[in-house]
């Protein structure tokens, strides 16, 4: 068995069965089951769901949506990602799987907006997300860093 990796989840009945394992683990606000059922198309690879399989079973998941700021009162301008419903099964928590999912999203090099759920503020702080407060509620934002050490045409490597 190789090292687990983040992959886009297919929208199909197998994924639906895997999502049922998460139903009792978290709060209702983390449930993706109804969202998946509403969008089920056999083997649709354009799903917003991403996860990590370990030993053939889904152990961690999140949903990731591409958005564009249309004047909302927060510090992201242009295209960004909304990361929702990050959840790791209890037996696999505190082993880096949640961080793997977030790092996958960071690797897309867009700003990320998320809402800290269920006492997870420390997790987002550890991953360099910044808290933002607006009249509609609080959330966390991460911005990709610009590489200040990039070699230009005029410099030598």
UniProtKB/Swiss-Prot annotation:
Domain of life of the native organism: Bacteria
Keyword Cell division carried by entry: no
Enzyme class at the top of the EC tree: transferase
Residue ranges occupied by any N-acetyltransferase domain in the UniProt entry: 9-146
Known EC number: 2.3.1.-
GO MF terms held by the record: acyltransferase activity, transferring groups other than amino-acyl groups
InterPro entries: Acyl_CoA_acyltransferase, GNAT_dom, YlbP
Keywords: Acyltransferase, Transferase
KW Acyltransferase (keyword) present: yes
Signal sequence, start to end: none
Protein's name according to its UniProt entry: Uncharacterized N-acetyltransferase BCE33L3680
Organism of derivation: Bacillus cereus (strain ZK / E33L)
């Amino acid at each position: 068995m190789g090292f687990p990796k983040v992959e886009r989840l297919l929208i199909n009945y197998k994924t639906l069965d895997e999502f049922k394992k998460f139903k009792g683990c978290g709060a209702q606000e983390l449930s993706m089951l109804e969202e998946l059922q509403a969008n089920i198309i056999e083997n649709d690879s354009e799903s917003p769901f991403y996860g990590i399989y370990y030993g053939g079973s889904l152990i961690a998941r999140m949903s990731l949506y591409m958005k564009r700021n249309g004047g909302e009162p927060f510090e992201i301008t242009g295209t960004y990602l909304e990361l929702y419903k990050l959840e790791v099964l209890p037996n696999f928590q505190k082993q880096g799987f949640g961080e793997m999912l977030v790092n996958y999203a960071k690797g897309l090099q867009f700003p990320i907006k998320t809402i800290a759920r269920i006492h997870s503020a420390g997790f987002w702080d550890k991953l360099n997300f910044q808290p933002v407060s607006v009249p509609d509620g609080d959330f966390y934002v991460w911005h990709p860093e610009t590489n200040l050490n990039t070699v230009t045409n005029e410099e030598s490597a």
